[in-house]
């Protein structure tokens, strides 16, 4: 799969609303977190095959000119499925809570709410063991269900 074939997947839901963003969805990340290091990218110009071991940013966003913007960004590692299918998948490397204060839950459907809650469960599970009690209180609150 090449990046230009993946890019429309990230833009799908915005496009359904007549919206888009003017940047690529993702770019290569190299040694010492060197950003915009190719050849891999997920964008309309991404013609490089995505291969196992490549690290790519995943950063869809939306910007309403002179009003606001949002971008949720993680780094992802391309990995091979362990099922002899020769398929690849992305494993999220950078895990941080999405700020729930910035989410308009009334605009989300049940699947979107479930995705955010599942993501936050993963964040908590992966980070909590490295935190002391004060930080753990913050992480627990930040990763709790968005509909409380």
Residue ranges and their predicted role:
Residues 1-26, 48:
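Gly/Pro-rich turn-and-neighbor structural signature
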Residues 24, 32-148:
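Charged, cofactor-coupling segments
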Residues 29:
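Active-site His/Glu-centered metal-binding helix of metallohydrolases
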């Amino acid at each position: 799969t090449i990046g230009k074939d993946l890019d429309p997947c990230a833009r799908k839901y915005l496009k359904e609303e007549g919206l888009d963003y003017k940047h690529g969805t993702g770019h290569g990340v190299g040694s010492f977190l060197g950003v915009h290091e190719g050849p891999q990218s997920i964008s309309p110009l991404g013609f490089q095959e995505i291969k196992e071991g490549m690290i790519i940013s995943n950063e869809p966003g939306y910007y309403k000119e002179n009003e606001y913007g949002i971008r949720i960004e993680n780094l992802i590692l391309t990995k091979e499925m362990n099922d002899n299918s020769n398929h690849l998948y992305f494993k999220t490397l950078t895990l941080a809570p999405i700020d729930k204060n910035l989410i308009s839950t009334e605009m989300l459907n049940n699947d979107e709410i479930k995705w955010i809650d599942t993501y936050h469960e993963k964040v908590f599970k992966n980070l909590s063991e490295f935190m002391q009690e004060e930080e753990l209180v913050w992480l627990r609150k930040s990763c709790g269900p968005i509909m409380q």
